[in-house]
Regions:
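TPR/TPR-like (Sel1-like) alpha-helical repeat modules
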Residues: 6, 143-144, 172-189
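Structural register within alpha-helical repeat arrays
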Residues: 49-54, 68, 85, 121-122, ...
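Residue-level recognition of tetratricopeptide repeat
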Residues: 43, 78, 112-115, 148-149
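Single conserved hydrophobic/aromatic residue that forms the stacking wall/gate
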Residues: 1-12
Length: 190
């Protein structure tokens, strides 16, 4: 067992050196971890490690990241696993399921900065689904979790700007752009 564990230690050291070398990119990590994730889809320790590496390398839009998140969610439906599954659905254009998993992650998460990012991602999914009032609500949630968070203000500006003719009164419709400018100025200020 000691020989076997040392062998694994060497494997992990080599992987760490490869990742830190700067040679590793999302495509190579997809090729390396894709088969390993499939082979280890019930091994939560391996899946956590793979997810951490993929996040560290900013490969959280790769198929292997989505698969690992999906398998991890089946074993242990944590907030992080739910977020991975939510992003998978978001990328596929299934915004209703994306919102469902983002909501679940929001309910489980305790860190307000992460909650802010999840609420913002939910707002973006709702905007894509053309559910503008709900998207606005999630932008406000994101801002309540993290005061100096500019992205929700930018998304709010996009929401308001995407529907400038919300009334039959032309004068009021022109005011929409003042709201857009206000939100962009707030985003710049934070």
């Amino acid at each position: 067992d000691l020989v076997r564990s040392r062998g694994l230690g060497d494997v992990y050291k080599r992987q760490a050196m490869f990742i830190q070398s700067g040679v590793a990119d999302c495509e190579s990590l997809q090729n390396i971890y894709g088969p390993k994730v499939e082979a280890s889809k019930t091994d939560s320790a391996f899946l956590k490690k793979a997810l951490n590496i993929l996040k560290l390398m900013k490969c959280n839009e790769s198929e292997v990241y989505f698969k690992a998140s999906e398998y991890m969610y089946q074993i242990d439906p944590t907030a992080d696993a739910a977020v991975g599954v939510a992003y998978m659905y978001y990328k596929k254009g299934d915004y209703d399921n994306a919102v469902k998993y983002f909501d679940e992650a929001l309910a489980k998460e305790t860190d307000n900065d992460k909650k802010a990012e999840m609420a913002y991602a939910t707002a973006a999914a709702l905007m894509q689904a053309k559910k503008l009032s709900q998207a606005r609500s999630y932008c406000q949630k994101a801002m309540s979790f993290k005061e100096n968070y500019g992205e929700p203000y930018i998304l709010l500006a996009q929401l308001y700007g995407s529907n400038p003719n919300w009334t039959d009164e032309p004068a009021l419709n022109k005011c929409t752009y003042f709201v857009v400018i206000d939100k962009l100025q707030r985003a710049k200020a934070v």
